[in-house]
Amino acid sequence: MGLNLNYSYTDCLAIFGVGGAHPGGLQLTKELLSREKIDETTSILDAGCGTGQTSAYIAEQYRCKVTSLDCNKLMLDKARQRFLSLHSPIETQQGSTENLPFSEGIFDIILSESVISFTDVSLTIPEFKRVLKPNGVLLAIEMVLEKSLSEEELKTIVNFYGVSQILTENEWKTLFQRAKFKQVSVEKFNLQIDENNVQNATDFSLSENIDDEFFEILEKHMHFTKVYKDVLGFRLFRCCN
């Protein structure tokens, strides 16, 4: 399955406009948010918002202030179109989690769904801490390495997804603790997703005239998911500021 990739995995997600492109999807997001104290006064940052599926849900469900940030212009354009069609008063911002365009201490909750791995973790994690209010909460869903892989296999996966590295649960925990988060809890999920429930269906916002190469990337992603299903897992990291 050797591909001469002109595009990245994240380019592929943007072109297909995949919403909820993280383990557990919107179903997991709803579960996590339902545990937090959220009302109209809560300020939430959806960091790496993608096409805005999560942001739109939060704004509708909780009627609170939501800020949606993504570095990918195409993703953000699709998010804006979504918010416009729903008449959602969500603030959008193009920018990097490694250098957030916000002053410090302004968010109660930061939601980061399969985002940190695609960045320089040593920059993103301290930035999240900086913009959180005292006692604010970071909810991060991240890929973890469940079993060791050969150097070659690891390199193949890292290069394909464009992630900086693939970390174990303990390595993630250490990084959050080093950033001086007061409390770091880790949770493993075994979600039973009801495929027949229309709300759990993958959300797409397709671009026109999609290059064949994007379908090849999607196919390779499905291949990796199958081959490495026992090796690549995910965790929720809940970090209190």
Where would I find each of the regions flagged by the language model?
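Short, glycine-/aromatic-enriched active-site segment of Class I SAM-dependent methyltransferases
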Residues: 16, 143-163
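Conserved alpha-helix/loop element of class I SAM-dependent methyltransferases that forms part
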Residues: 22-40
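Class I SAM-dependent methyltransferase SAM/SAH-binding core
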Residues: 45-47, 51-99
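A short acidic, Gly/Pro-enriched loop at the edge of an enzyme's catalytic core
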Residues: 98-109
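A short SAM/SAH-binding and catalytic strip from SAM-dependent methyltransferases
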Residues: 109-121
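A short glycine-rich, Lys/Arg-flanked "PGG" loop and its adjoining helix->strand segment in the class I
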Residues: 122-137
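Short alpha-helix
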Residues: 164-180
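Conserved Class I S-adenosyl-L-methionine
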Residues: 185-241
